[in-house]
Protein backbone atom coordinates (compact mmCIF):
# COMPACT_ATOMS: atom_id res chain seq x y z
CA UNK A 1 0.00 0.00 0.00
CA UNK A 2 1.19 3.50 -0.86
CA UNK A 3 -0.04 6.52 1.07
CA UNK A 4 0.82 10.16 0.42
CA UNK A 5 0.07 13.32 2.38
CA UNK A 6 0.45 16.42 0.23
CA UNK A 7 -0.89 19.60 1.86
CA UNK A 8 -0.73 22.57 -0.52
CA UNK A 9 0.76 25.05 0.11
CA UNK A 10 1.49 24.56 3.81
CA UNK A 11 3.51 21.35 3.70
CA UNK A 12 6.83 22.90 2.74
CA UNK A 13 7.14 20.75 -0.38
CA UNK A 14 7.59 21.95 -3.94
CA UNK A 15 4.10 22.63 -5.26
CA UNK A 16 4.32 24.17 -8.73
CA UNK A 17 1.20 26.06 -9.81
CA UNK A 18 -1.14 24.38 -7.29
CA UNK A 19 -3.03 26.65 -4.91
CA UNK A 20 -5.75 26.40 -2.27
CA UNK A 21 -7.04 29.75 -3.59
CA UNK A 22 -6.83 29.26 -7.36
CA UNK A 23 -7.11 32.15 -9.79
CA UNK A 24 -5.11 33.80 -12.56
CA UNK A 25 -1.86 31.89 -13.07
CA UNK A 26 -2.43 29.67 -9.99
CA UNK A 27 -4.60 26.59 -10.37
CA UNK A 28 -6.71 24.16 -8.38
CA UNK A 29 -4.55 21.74 -6.39
CA UNK A 30 -4.73 18.10 -7.47
CA UNK A 31 -5.59 15.75 -4.62
CA UNK A 32 -4.27 12.23 -4.25
CA UNK A 33 -1.46 10.55 -6.15
CA UNK A 34 -1.62 12.13 -9.60
CA UNK A 35 1.35 10.35 -11.20
CA UNK A 36 2.09 6.74 -12.09
CA UNK A 37 2.51 4.17 -9.31
CA UNK A 38 3.11 0.49 -9.95
CA UNK A 39 4.49 -2.72 -8.46
CA UNK A 40 6.42 -5.44 -10.23
CA UNK A 41 8.09 -8.71 -9.19
CA UNK A 42 11.91 -8.67 -9.35
CA UNK A 43 14.63 -11.25 -8.74
CA UNK A 44 15.83 -11.10 -5.15
CA UNK A 45 19.55 -10.70 -5.89
CA UNK A 46 20.06 -9.53 -9.46
CA UNK A 47 17.29 -6.98 -9.96
CA UNK A 48 18.19 -4.19 -12.40
CA UNK A 49 16.86 -0.95 -10.92
CA UNK A 50 18.00 1.69 -13.41
CA UNK A 51 19.50 2.06 -16.88
CA UNK A 52 20.70 5.34 -18.34
CA UNK A 53 23.11 6.38 -21.08
CA UNK A 54 25.42 9.29 -21.79
CA UNK A 55 26.64 10.18 -25.29
CA UNK A 56 30.38 10.51 -25.84
CA UNK A 57 31.49 14.08 -26.56
CA UNK A 58 32.62 13.12 -30.08
CA UNK A 59 29.27 11.37 -30.73
CA UNK A 60 30.96 8.08 -31.73
CA UNK A 61 29.20 6.07 -29.04
CA UNK A 62 27.77 6.19 -25.56
CA UNK A 63 28.24 4.87 -22.04
CA UNK A 64 25.60 2.70 -20.41
CA UNK A 65 25.16 2.95 -16.64
CA UNK A 66 23.32 0.07 -14.99
CA UNK A 67 22.26 -0.05 -11.35
CA UNK A 68 21.35 -3.35 -9.71
CA UNK A 69 20.40 -4.59 -6.25
CA UNK A 70 23.80 -6.24 -5.90
CA UNK A 71 27.17 -6.09 -7.70
CA UNK A 72 26.76 -7.99 -10.94
CA UNK A 73 28.25 -8.54 -14.35
CA UNK A 74 26.11 -6.81 -16.94
CA UNK A 75 25.63 -7.61 -20.62
CA UNK A 76 24.36 -4.90 -22.98
CA UNK A 77 23.11 -5.84 -26.45
CA UNK A 78 22.55 -2.95 -28.86
CA UNK A 79 20.44 -3.23 -32.01
CA UNK A 80 22.12 -1.42 -34.92
CA UNK A 81 20.19 0.64 -37.50
CA UNK A 82 21.79 -1.23 -40.40
CA UNK A 83 20.79 -4.57 -38.86
CA UNK A 84 22.52 -6.89 -36.46
CA UNK A 85 23.68 -6.17 -32.94
CA UNK A 86 26.76 -5.35 -30.94
CA UNK A 87 27.35 -6.69 -27.45
CA UNK A 88 29.45 -5.37 -24.58
CA UNK A 89 29.91 -6.44 -20.97
CA UNK A 90 30.84 -4.66 -17.79
CA UNK A 91 29.93 -4.19 -14.15
CA UNK A 92 26.86 -2.63 -12.59
CA UNK A 93 27.65 0.81 -11.23
CA UNK A 94 30.41 1.47 -13.75
CA UNK A 95 30.26 3.02 -17.25
CA UNK A 96 30.03 0.42 -20.02
CA UNK A 97 31.28 1.91 -23.29
CA UNK A 98 29.46 1.20 -26.55
CA UNK A 99 31.34 2.23 -29.68
CA UNK A 100 29.45 2.94 -32.90
CA UNK A 101 31.12 2.76 -36.31
CA UNK A 102 28.44 4.77 -38.14
CA UNK A 103 26.40 6.42 -35.39
CA UNK A 104 22.87 7.50 -36.23
CA UNK A 105 22.23 10.55 -34.09
CA UNK A 106 19.01 11.57 -32.38
CA UNK A 107 17.70 14.94 -33.58
CA UNK A 108 14.33 16.66 -34.11
CA UNK A 109 14.49 15.75 -37.82
CA UNK A 110 15.57 12.14 -37.18
CA UNK A 111 14.67 11.03 -33.64
CA UNK A 112 16.37 7.66 -33.93
CA UNK A 113 16.92 5.64 -30.75
CA UNK A 114 19.08 2.56 -30.28
CA UNK A 115 17.26 -0.36 -28.72
CA UNK A 116 19.08 -1.90 -25.74
CA UNK A 117 18.69 -5.25 -24.00
CA UNK A 118 20.40 -5.28 -20.63
CA UNK A 119 20.84 -8.41 -18.53
CA UNK A 120 22.33 -9.09 -15.10
CA UNK A 121 22.04 -12.57 -13.67
CA UNK A 122 18.39 -13.61 -13.83
CA UNK A 123 17.05 -10.16 -14.69
CA UNK A 124 16.71 -8.62 -18.16
CA UNK A 125 15.27 -5.26 -19.22
CA UNK A 126 14.84 -3.32 -22.45
CA UNK A 127 15.72 0.35 -22.85
CA UNK A 128 16.56 3.05 -25.40
CA UNK A 129 19.50 5.31 -26.13
CA UNK A 130 19.25 8.53 -28.10
CA UNK A 131 22.75 9.56 -29.19
CA UNK A 132 22.97 13.36 -29.17
CA UNK A 133 24.92 16.24 -27.69
CA UNK A 134 23.75 19.75 -26.84
CA UNK A 135 25.93 22.77 -26.12
CA UNK A 136 26.29 26.51 -26.67
CA UNK A 137 28.71 27.45 -29.43
CA UNK A 138 29.31 29.54 -32.54
CA UNK A 139 26.93 29.01 -35.45
CA UNK A 140 28.98 26.93 -37.92
CA UNK A 141 30.01 29.07 -40.89
CA UNK A 142 28.32 32.22 -39.58
CA UNK A 143 29.87 35.64 -39.22
CA UNK A 144 32.01 35.61 -36.03
CA UNK A 145 30.10 38.64 -34.77
CA UNK A 146 26.90 36.59 -34.45
CA UNK A 147 25.90 35.53 -30.96
CA UNK A 148 26.40 31.91 -30.08
CA UNK A 149 23.49 29.49 -30.33
CA UNK A 150 22.20 26.12 -29.18
CA UNK A 151 24.05 23.36 -31.01
CA UNK A 152 22.41 19.95 -31.25
CA UNK A 153 24.99 17.47 -32.53
CA UNK A 154 27.11 20.43 -33.58
CA UNK A 155 24.35 22.03 -35.69
CA UNK A 156 22.79 25.36 -34.71
CA UNK A 157 19.11 24.99 -33.78
CA UNK A 158 16.65 27.74 -32.89
CA UNK A 159 14.71 26.34 -29.93
CA UNK A 160 11.08 27.25 -30.63
CA UNK A 161 8.52 25.93 -28.16
CA UNK A 162 5.22 26.74 -26.50
CA UNK A 163 4.77 26.73 -22.72
CA UNK A 164 3.31 23.36 -21.68
CA UNK A 165 1.75 23.27 -18.21
CA UNK A 166 0.28 19.77 -18.33
CA UNK A 167 -3.21 20.41 -16.89
CA UNK A 168 -6.53 18.89 -17.98
CA UNK A 169 -10.05 20.08 -17.08
CA UNK A 170 -11.35 16.93 -15.39
CA UNK A 171 -8.17 15.53 -13.86
CA UNK A 172 -5.87 18.46 -13.10
CA UNK A 173 -2.25 17.31 -13.19
CA UNK A 174 -3.21 13.76 -14.17
CA UNK A 175 -3.45 13.14 -17.93
CA UNK A 176 -6.74 11.40 -18.79
CA UNK A 177 -4.85 8.80 -20.86
CA UNK A 178 -1.40 8.11 -22.24
CA UNK A 179 -2.69 9.26 -25.62
CA UNK A 180 -3.34 12.72 -24.14
CA UNK A 181 0.40 13.20 -23.55
CA UNK A 182 1.23 12.33 -27.14
CA UNK A 183 -1.68 14.43 -28.45
CA UNK A 184 -0.31 17.71 -27.08
CA UNK A 185 3.15 17.04 -28.50
CA UNK A 186 1.78 16.11 -31.91
CA UNK A 187 -0.53 19.13 -31.97
CA UNK A 188 2.38 21.48 -31.30
CA UNK A 189 4.59 19.79 -33.89
CA UNK A 190 1.84 20.20 -36.47
CA UNK A 191 1.79 23.94 -35.72
CA UNK A 192 5.51 24.12 -36.50
CA UNK A 193 7.13 24.10 -33.05
CA UNK A 194 10.18 21.91 -32.45
CA UNK A 195 9.62 21.27 -28.76
CA UNK A 196 7.84 22.29 -25.57
CA UNK A 197 8.82 23.95 -22.33
CA UNK A 198 7.43 21.69 -19.59
CA UNK A 199 6.45 24.34 -17.09
CA UNK A 200 6.77 23.85 -13.33
CA UNK A 201 5.83 20.17 -13.55
CA UNK A 202 7.65 16.87 -13.96
CA UNK A 203 5.49 14.63 -16.11
CA UNK A 204 5.20 10.87 -16.17
CA UNK A 205 8.14 9.40 -18.04
CA UNK A 206 5.65 8.33 -20.70
CA UNK A 207 5.55 11.97 -21.79
CA UNK A 208 9.32 12.10 -22.29
CA UNK A 209 9.26 8.77 -24.12
CA UNK A 210 6.74 10.27 -26.56
CA UNK A 211 8.94 13.37 -26.97
CA UNK A 212 11.98 11.15 -27.60
CA UNK A 213 10.03 9.21 -30.22
CA UNK A 214 8.59 12.30 -31.92
CA UNK A 215 11.80 14.36 -31.92
CA UNK A 216 10.40 17.15 -29.75
CA UNK A 217 12.94 19.09 -27.70
CA UNK A 218 12.00 19.54 -24.04
CA UNK A 219 12.97 22.46 -21.82
CA UNK A 220 12.32 21.10 -18.33
CA UNK A 221 11.49 23.43 -15.45
CA UNK A 222 12.47 22.58 -11.90
CA UNK A 223 9.31 22.54 -9.77
CA UNK A 224 9.17 25.64 -7.60
CA UNK A 225 8.50 25.97 -3.91
CA UNK A 226 8.93 28.92 -1.61
CA UNK A 227 6.95 31.96 -2.72
CA UNK A 228 6.73 34.51 -5.56
CA UNK A 229 8.86 37.57 -4.78
CA UNK A 230 6.71 40.02 -6.73
CA UNK A 231 3.06 40.52 -7.63
CA UNK A 232 1.72 40.39 -11.18
CA UNK A 233 1.50 44.20 -11.29
CA UNK A 234 5.06 44.56 -10.00
CA UNK A 235 6.26 42.11 -12.64
CA UNK A 236 5.06 44.44 -15.38
CA UNK A 237 7.34 47.18 -14.05
CA UNK A 238 10.21 44.70 -13.76
CA UNK A 239 9.74 43.66 -17.40
CA UNK A 240 9.57 47.26 -18.59
CA UNK A 241 12.65 48.46 -16.68
CA UNK A 242 14.61 45.17 -16.62
CA UNK A 243 15.04 45.48 -12.85
CA UNK A 244 17.43 42.98 -11.25
CA UNK A 245 17.60 42.01 -7.56
CA UNK A 246 19.98 39.75 -5.65
CA UNK A 247 19.12 36.36 -4.18
CA UNK A 248 21.66 35.56 -1.45
CA UNK A 249 20.98 37.91 1.49
CA UNK A 250 18.66 36.94 4.32
CA UNK A 251 16.05 39.46 3.14
CA UNK A 252 16.11 37.91 -0.35
CA UNK A 253 15.55 34.42 1.08
CA UNK A 254 12.70 35.71 3.23
CA UNK A 255 11.00 37.39 0.26
CA UNK A 256 11.29 34.15 -1.73
CA UNK A 257 9.88 31.99 1.06
CA UNK A 258 13.25 30.28 1.55
CA UNK A 259 14.19 31.24 5.10
CA UNK A 260 13.78 27.63 6.20
CA UNK A 261 16.91 25.52 5.71
CA UNK A 262 14.71 22.42 5.56
CA UNK A 263 12.74 23.94 2.68
CA UNK A 264 15.93 24.74 0.76
CA UNK A 265 17.29 21.26 1.36
CA UNK A 266 14.02 19.76 0.13
CA UNK A 267 14.30 21.78 -3.08
CA UNK A 268 17.82 20.54 -3.69
CA UNK A 269 16.88 16.91 -3.00
CA UNK A 270 13.98 17.21 -5.44
CA UNK A 271 16.24 18.88 -8.01
CA UNK A 272 18.64 15.94 -7.88
CA UNK A 273 15.73 13.50 -8.09
CA UNK A 274 14.36 15.19 -11.21
CA UNK A 275 17.74 15.05 -12.97
CA UNK A 276 18.13 11.39 -12.05
CA UNK A 277 14.61 10.58 -13.29
CA UNK A 278 14.89 12.32 -16.66
CA UNK A 279 18.57 11.78 -17.46
CA UNK A 280 17.86 8.86 -19.86
CA UNK A 281 15.79 11.03 -22.23
CA UNK A 282 17.49 12.57 -25.27
CA UNK A 283 14.61 15.01 -25.74
CA UNK A 284 15.50 16.93 -22.55
CA UNK A 285 18.06 19.51 -23.66
CA UNK A 286 17.68 22.27 -21.06
CA UNK A 287 16.85 22.77 -17.39
CA UNK A 288 15.06 25.88 -16.10
CA UNK A 289 16.34 26.38 -12.56
CA UNK A 290 14.10 29.25 -11.43
CA UNK A 291 11.08 30.88 -13.06
CA UNK A 292 10.13 34.52 -12.42
CA UNK A 293 11.99 34.47 -9.08
CA UNK A 294 9.48 32.06 -7.49
CA UNK A 295 11.42 30.67 -4.56
CA UNK A 296 14.67 31.88 -6.14
CA UNK A 297 17.76 31.78 -3.95
CA UNK A 298 21.52 31.36 -4.41
CA UNK A 299 21.17 30.94 -8.17
CA UNK A 300 24.90 30.91 -8.92
CA UNK A 301 25.60 28.16 -6.38
CA UNK A 302 22.64 26.08 -7.49
CA UNK A 303 23.60 26.46 -11.14
CA UNK A 304 26.97 24.94 -10.23
CA UNK A 305 25.25 22.17 -8.30
CA UNK A 306 22.97 21.41 -11.25
CA UNK A 307 25.94 21.28 -13.64
CA UNK A 308 27.67 18.85 -11.28
CA UNK A 309 24.60 16.61 -11.48
CA UNK A 310 24.34 16.93 -15.26
CA UNK A 311 27.13 18.56 -17.28
CA UNK A 312 25.54 17.48 -20.58
CA UNK A 313 22.54 19.83 -20.78
CA UNK A 314 21.98 23.59 -20.92
CA UNK A 315 20.71 25.71 -18.04
CA UNK A 316 18.33 28.67 -18.04
CA UNK A 317 19.27 29.76 -14.53
CA UNK A 318 16.75 32.59 -14.01
CA UNK A 319 13.89 32.57 -16.49
CA UNK A 320 12.12 35.91 -16.71
CA UNK A 321 13.94 38.26 -14.38
CA UNK A 322 16.36 38.67 -11.45
CA UNK A 323 19.17 37.47 -13.69
CA UNK A 324 22.35 36.86 -11.69
CA UNK A 325 24.52 36.93 -14.81
CA UNK A 326 25.09 33.18 -15.09
CA UNK A 327 23.34 30.42 -16.96
CA UNK A 328 23.67 29.76 -20.66
CA UNK A 329 21.23 32.48 -21.75
CA UNK A 330 20.04 36.02 -21.31
CA UNK A 331 16.51 34.88 -20.46
CA UNK A 332 13.61 37.32 -20.34
CA UNK A 333 9.80 37.28 -20.27
CA UNK A 334 7.86 39.92 -22.17
CA UNK A 335 4.08 40.22 -22.08
CA UNK A 336 1.98 43.08 -23.51
CA UNK A 337 5.09 45.25 -23.92
CA UNK A 338 6.74 45.43 -27.31
CA UNK A 339 9.58 42.94 -27.82
CA UNK A 340 12.99 44.59 -27.71
CA UNK A 341 16.56 43.73 -28.69
CA UNK A 342 18.99 42.47 -26.05
CA UNK A 343 21.80 44.88 -25.16
CA UNK A 344 25.12 44.46 -26.95
CA UNK A 345 26.99 44.32 -23.63
CA UNK A 346 25.38 40.95 -22.79
CA UNK A 347 26.72 38.48 -25.35
CA UNK A 348 24.90 35.42 -24.08
CA UNK A 349 22.37 33.92 -26.51
CA UNK A 350 19.05 35.75 -26.12
CA UNK A 351 16.24 33.47 -24.96
CA UNK A 352 12.74 34.98 -24.94
CA UNK A 353 11.61 32.35 -22.47
CA UNK A 354 7.98 33.56 -22.34
CA UNK A 355 6.01 35.88 -24.62
CA UNK A 356 2.64 36.08 -26.33
CA UNK A 357 -0.23 34.95 -24.15
CA UNK A 358 -2.96 36.15 -26.49
CA UNK A 359 -6.43 35.34 -25.17
CA UNK A 360 -9.48 34.04 -26.98
CA UNK A 361 -12.34 32.43 -25.06
CA UNK A 362 -14.22 29.85 -27.14
CA UNK A 363 -17.90 29.41 -26.30
CA UNK A 364 -18.61 25.95 -24.94
CA UNK A 365 -14.94 25.11 -24.42
CA UNK A 366 -14.00 27.28 -21.45
CA UNK A 367 -13.42 26.31 -17.83
CA UNK A 368 -16.40 28.07 -16.25
CA UNK A 369 -18.38 31.27 -16.36
CA UNK A 370 -16.07 33.31 -14.15
CA UNK A 371 -13.76 36.11 -15.21
CA UNK A 372 -10.94 35.52 -17.63
CA UNK A 373 -7.26 36.04 -16.91
CA UNK A 374 -4.65 36.99 -19.47
CA UNK A 375 -2.59 39.67 -21.14
CA UNK A 376 -4.08 40.60 -24.53
CA UNK A 377 -7.72 39.76 -25.29
CA UNK A 378 -9.42 39.10 -28.63
CA UNK A 379 -13.08 38.69 -29.48
CA UNK A 380 -12.84 36.35 -32.47
CA UNK A 381 -10.36 34.09 -34.33
CA UNK A 382 -9.73 36.65 -37.07
CA UNK A 383 -8.51 39.22 -34.53
CA UNK A 384 -6.30 36.58 -32.89
CA UNK A 385 -4.77 35.59 -36.22
CA UNK A 386 -4.07 39.20 -37.14
CA UNK A 387 -2.42 39.87 -33.79
CA UNK A 388 -0.23 36.76 -33.98
CA UNK A 389 0.90 37.56 -37.52
CA UNK A 390 1.84 41.08 -36.44
CA UNK A 391 3.62 39.84 -33.29
CA UNK A 392 5.75 37.35 -35.20
CA UNK A 393 6.46 39.35 -38.35
CA UNK A 394 7.09 42.80 -36.93
CA UNK A 395 8.57 41.92 -33.51
CA UNK A 396 9.74 38.33 -32.97
CA UNK A 397 11.30 37.32 -36.28
CA UNK A 398 13.40 40.52 -36.64
CA UNK A 399 15.01 39.70 -33.27
CA UNK A 400 16.82 36.70 -34.81
CA UNK A 401 19.26 39.10 -36.48
CA UNK A 402 19.94 40.60 -33.04
CA UNK A 403 20.71 37.43 -31.11
CA UNK A 404 17.39 35.64 -30.53
CA UNK A 405 18.26 31.94 -30.20
CA UNK A 406 15.16 30.55 -28.54
CA UNK A 407 11.58 31.50 -27.69
CA UNK A 408 8.61 30.15 -25.74
CA UNK A 409 5.08 31.15 -26.75
CA UNK A 410 2.45 31.11 -23.98
CA UNK A 411 0.91 28.54 -24.23
CA UNK A 412 -0.16 25.03 -25.38
CA UNK A 413 -3.70 25.14 -23.99
CA UNK A 414 -6.02 27.17 -21.83
CA UNK A 415 -5.71 26.36 -18.12
CA UNK A 416 -8.75 27.04 -15.95
CA UNK A 417 -9.51 30.78 -16.30
CA UNK A 418 -6.42 31.47 -18.44
CA UNK A 419 -7.69 31.56 -22.02
CA UNK A 420 -4.39 32.17 -23.81
CA UNK A 421 -3.83 28.67 -25.14
CA UNK A 422 -3.28 27.68 -28.74
CA UNK A 423 -5.77 24.93 -27.87
CA UNK A 424 -8.84 25.11 -25.70
CA UNK A 425 -8.62 23.48 -22.26
CA UNK A 426 -10.49 20.40 -23.53
CA UNK A 427 -8.14 20.21 -26.55
CA UNK A 428 -11.13 20.25 -28.91
CA UNK A 429 -10.39 23.53 -30.74
CA UNK A 430 -7.20 24.91 -32.29
CA UNK A 431 -7.77 28.63 -31.85
CA UNK A 432 -5.40 30.27 -34.35
CA UNK A 433 -5.42 29.25 -37.99
CA UNK A 434 -3.14 26.19 -38.10
CA UNK A 435 -1.74 27.03 -41.53
CA UNK A 436 -0.90 30.54 -40.35
CA UNK A 437 1.00 29.24 -37.29
CA UNK A 438 2.90 26.78 -39.46
CA UNK A 439 3.78 29.62 -41.85
CA UNK A 440 4.90 31.96 -39.06
CA UNK A 441 7.13 29.31 -37.54
CA UNK A 442 8.58 28.54 -40.98
CA UNK A 443 9.44 32.23 -41.38
CA UNK A 444 11.11 32.19 -37.97
CA UNK A 445 13.30 29.23 -38.95
CA UNK A 446 14.08 30.88 -42.30
CA UNK A 447 15.36 33.98 -40.51
CA UNK A 448 17.64 31.77 -38.42
CA UNK A 449 18.85 29.90 -41.52
CA UNK A 450 19.70 33.26 -43.11
CA UNK A 451 22.43 33.80 -40.49
CA UNK A 452 23.77 30.25 -40.82
CA UNK A 453 21.50 28.20 -38.58
CA UNK A 454 19.75 24.94 -39.37
CA UNK A 455 16.41 25.61 -41.14
Q: Where are the language model's segments positioned?
A:
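Secreted/periplasmic carbohydrate-active enzymes, especially glycoside hydrolases
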Residues: 1-210, 214-218, 270, 285-286, ...
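Substrate-binding/catalytic cleft of secreted carbohydrate-active enzymes
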Residues: 186-187, 195-440, 447-454
Amino acid sequence: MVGVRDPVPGGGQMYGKQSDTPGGIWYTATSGIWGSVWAEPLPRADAITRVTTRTHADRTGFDVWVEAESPAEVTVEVELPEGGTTMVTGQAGEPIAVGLRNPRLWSPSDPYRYRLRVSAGEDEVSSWAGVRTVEIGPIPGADPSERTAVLVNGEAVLVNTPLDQGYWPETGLTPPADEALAFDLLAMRELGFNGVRKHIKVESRRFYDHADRLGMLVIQDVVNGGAPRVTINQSRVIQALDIQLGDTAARHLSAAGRSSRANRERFEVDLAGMVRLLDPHACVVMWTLFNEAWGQYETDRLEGYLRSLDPTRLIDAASGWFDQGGGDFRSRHRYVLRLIRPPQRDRRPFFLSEFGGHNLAVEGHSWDGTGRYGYTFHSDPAALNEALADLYRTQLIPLVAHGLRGCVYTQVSDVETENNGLLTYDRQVVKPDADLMLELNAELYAAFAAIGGTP
